[in-house]
Design a protein with these regions (language model features):
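Short acidic (Asp/Glu) and glycine-rich catalytic loops that position anionic groups and cofactors
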Residues: 12-15, 42, 165-173, 204-207, ...
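Radical SAM enzyme core and accessory elements
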Residues: 191-246
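Catalytic cores of alpha/beta
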Residues: 58-63, 121-139
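Conserved SAM/AdoMet-binding glycine-rich loop
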Residues: 1-121
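Proline-aspartate-enriched helix->loop->beta-strand connector
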Residues: 13, 140-141
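Short secondary-structure boundary/capping segments
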Residues: 32-36, 89-93, 127-131, 157-165
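Non-cysteine beta-strand/loop elements that form the S-adenosyl-L-methionine
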Residues: 60-80, 141-150, 156, 166-168
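Alpha-amylase-like alpha-glycosidases and glucanotransferases acting on alpha-linked glucans and related
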Residues: 98, 133, 161, 166-202
Length: 246
């Protein structure tokens, strides 16, 4: 790996994405890789997906000591609901995941993005709104809301009938409906994702958007309704226009 990174470094590449979906599944290996990545600071930023429920104290110590800009983290939390995670057969306890996520979001030397997945079994639309509120309170660097996709050969696709999930037979095989979220509600979740990208995930407006979310639990509902009714949710807007809309 060191040799490959040396080649990458020699070509002036500034960003490397590690494709391991659970970088810290093996804490010892994760620690060794972090020390290897450190050799290429400040020239390369490494993008990792990390499981917040599997953060050992030793790994936390390593993360605290890293220089700013070395890592860009994605915490694949998917949902903040225990029944949803259990039904989806996600590893780790929710309490551990939340504790780990709070820790990651508190680090000033790296940015942590949190992912939620609409269309997971048992996951309701109102719970998605509540989870966004919680993540905003954690000060997540970005909140990314995606729709579940049932790729051929995956366990979730094999269990689709059992779980009451209807999905498109065509790529990208997006979930269309579950027992807990309707077709229309999934469309609302997609519009909510656009809202997050346009406002919360935009650095210029993140602090204001976070403050509005945390000061009023109904803000996201009302703001999304306004953007939809005004036909703004699918329209590209300049930074200045977004500020005026807020």
């Amino acid at each position: 790996i060191r040799h490959r990174l040396q080649i990458i470094h020699s070509h002036g590449i500034k960003n490397v994405r590690v494709l391991d979906r659970t970088f810290n599944y093996n804490p010892r290996r994760a620690k060794e890789l972090l020390r290897l990545f450190l050799e290429f600071s400040p020239d390369i930023c490494f993008h990792l997906e990390i499981h917040p429920a599997l953060l050992s104290e030793e790994l936390k110590k390593e993360l605290r000591q890293l220089p700013a800009g070395l890592l860009h983290l994605e915490a694949g939390i998917q949902s903040l609901r225990e029944p949803v995670l259990e039904k989806s057969r996600r590893i780790g306890k929710l309490s551990d995941a939340l504790e780990g996520l709070k820790f990651l979001c508190s680090l000033s030397n790296m940015e942590t993005h949190a992912d939620l997945i609409a269309g997971l079994p048992l996951y309701r639309l109102d719970e998605i709104f509540e989870d966004i509120y919680t993540l905003a309170g954690y000060r997540a660097g970005e909140i990314q809301l995606e729709s579940l996709k049932l790729l051929p050969g995956t366990e979730m696709r094999h269990r689709a009938d059992e779980l009451g999930i209807r999905y498109s037979p065509l790529p990208p095989y997006e979930v269309l409906q579950t027992g807990e979220i309707s077709v229309g509600e999934l469309q609302t979740a997609r519009r909510l994702s656009r809202l997050l990208d346009a406002f919360y995930n935009t650095p210029a407006w993140q602090e204001l958007t976070r403050e509005l979310i945390l000061n009023d639990r109904r803000f996201l509902y009302r703001f999304l309704a306004y953007l939809t009714e005004a036909n703004l949710i699918d329209q590209p807007m300049s930074l200045e226009r977004r500020g005026l809309v807020l």
